């Protein structure tokens, strides 16, 4: 068994690598070949829309973009994203909020690229939520983000484990 990109994503999971590594060692002791890889950094990268509740994308990016133009929908989505009980892998909360979400791609709003959402919002004089939603609308929800969602100690412990190797997605 190969566990690819073994990580503890999001603050609620920090420290749980002790349990997962113990399970891997137990399996190996029982004759099950288990290995893993981990990239040597504390961020994960995907689209910025990954931090929004996924069920609103059922009709595609264009439909979601249209919904994001409505202030009542924005308020509903914000409440869902801020609620840890909302049942989805919440990248916004995993990153500790907008201060941990970095924009690497936003072709229609290039001034956002290279900045955390909070920095970008400050630079344009907007609330981070408004800046995020406006950027998503301008880019038809086709943006890229980097999420600061892991801690150094967890990453280092996994990499030091004899079952692990380094990996990188390029």
Locate each region found by the language model.
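Active-site neighborhoods of metal-dependent hydrolases
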Residues: 4-170
């Amino acid at each position: 068994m190969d566990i690819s990109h073994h990580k503890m994503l999001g603050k609620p999971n920090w420290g749980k690598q002790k349990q997962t590594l113990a399970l891997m060692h137990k399996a190996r002791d029982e004759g099950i070949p288990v290995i893993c890889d981990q990239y040597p950094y504390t961020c994960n990268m995907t689209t910025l829309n990954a931090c929004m509740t996924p069920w609103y994308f059922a009709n595609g990016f264009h439909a979601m973009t249209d919904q994001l133009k409505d202030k009542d929908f924005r308020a509903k989505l914000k409440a869902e994203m801020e609620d840890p009980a909302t049942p989805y892998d919440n990248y916004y909360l995993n990153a500790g909020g907008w201060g941990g979400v970095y924009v690497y791609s936003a072709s229609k709003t290039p001034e956002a690229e290279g900045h955390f959402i909070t920095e970008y919002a400050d630079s344009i004089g907007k609330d981070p939520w408004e800046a995020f939603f406006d950027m998503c609308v301008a880019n038809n929800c086709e943006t890229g983000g980097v999420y600061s969602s892991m801690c150094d100690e967890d990453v280092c412990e996994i990499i030091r484990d004899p079952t692990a190797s380094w990996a990188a997605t390029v």
